[in-house]
Regions:
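Phosphate/pyrophosphate-binding loop motifs in nucleotide- or prenyl diphosphate-using proteins
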Residues: 28-223
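Intrinsic disorder/low-complexity segments
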Residues: 1-33
């Protein structure tokens, strides 16, 4: 990939490094095969309680948009923990694929929908949504039908995937709140929604390989 294209893609898609100072250094860094090389992690630009979006706009760190892509980053980290406990190669491949897509999703949210951009920002695509749906269908077909709601737990891998699922649900709620105020990429919203479903299915899948799901028993402790 030419450096210019890779550099623009980086600037459009890295919410965790999108301070104005880092963007400035990335823009003026020399051409290389790795345009994301950063020689310094802290920038002091967030010391006033604000952070920069991918387009340079400044927002308070408690803003719902920052909370949304922060939750996506959190979910990605939880998936990383889940991967430490997953032995199935197919599940590992899916989770690693998702981790990369979550950077796309965070980058999408870090670049608000605007018109008349010089460079088209990186956006989550319908193809990525379809990929998630196909994996849901594939893994769900191998599972026994559900007889009750599932309690989060079972194997360590499943427990962490349930955790990631709930974090993604939180991110989706933040994204929906943003969408009531300003345009949000519809594919990004659908991706977040489908991803929580995929993580639920994968949690059940790894549980069936090691330990049965823990089912909810309504009113078990009422008497």
């Amino acid at each position: 990939m030419p450096f210019g294209s890779a550099r623009d893609e980086f600037l459009n898609s890295a919410p965790h490094f999108a301070t104005s100072e880092v963007r400035e250094r990335a823009v003026h860094s020399p051409a290389s095969d790795n345009p994301m090389k950063l020689d310094r992690i802290y920038t002091r630009s967030g010391d006033d309680g604000r952070t920069s979006l991918g387009d340079g706009a400044r927002l308070p760190k408690f803003h719902v948009r920052v909370a949304a892509y922060g939750s996506i980053d959190e979910a990605n980290s939880v998936i990383g923990i889940a991967l430490l406990h997953v032995e199935d190669a197919a599940v590992r491949d899916v989770l690693t694929h998702v981790q990369n897509d979550l950077f796309d999703l965070g980058g999408d949210l870090c670049r608000p929908e605007r018109e008349h951009r010089k460079v088209e920002p990186l956006r989550v695509s319908e193809r990525q949504v379809r990929w998630i749906e196909e994996r849901i269908d594939l893994f769900n077909a191998a599972l026994a039908p559900l007889e009750s709601f599932v309690l989060p737990g079972g194997t360590p891998a499943a427990a962490h995937m349930h955790h990631a699922r709930t974090v993604i649900r939180r991110a989706e709620r933040y994204m929906t709140e943003i969408a009531y105020q300003e345009p949000v990429n519809p594919a990004a919203l659908r991706y977040a929604n489908r991803l929580s479903d995929l993580l639920f299915v994968l949690a059940r899948y790894v549980n069936e390989q090691g330990r049965a799901d823990v089912l909810w028993r309504p009113g078990l402790h009422r008497a």
